[in-house]
Amino acid sequence: MAKYYVIGKVSKELLHRMQKDPTADRFISTQKVIEAVGGKMISYEWVRGRFDVMCCVEGDAETVVGMKVAFLNSGLMDELMIHEVIDYNKAFGKAADAAKSVVKPAE
């Protein structure tokens, strides 16, 4: 399974709901959504900065996109970014192979 980092900005609606119920377990509710689409949540953290929430999810691309659509359509999130974890050694190895085939004009 591929691993993805999902970084999100919560909506004002969710902020209001959490202020009314600060002990609500967002980990469990988030985990249920991810499992409903066939994914597995590895970690879930609230962070300071431009975004509010970061979680690590295992699954395929369709699973993670399905989760994203469900959260955005719920109105609880304003923005979600998906970042797939890659093997950078393989990626740069392929870049090195491809570079051997690059032909610049007029050379």
Residue ranges and their predicted role:
Residues M1-E107:
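A compositional/biophysical signature of low hydrophobicity enriched in polar/charged and small residues
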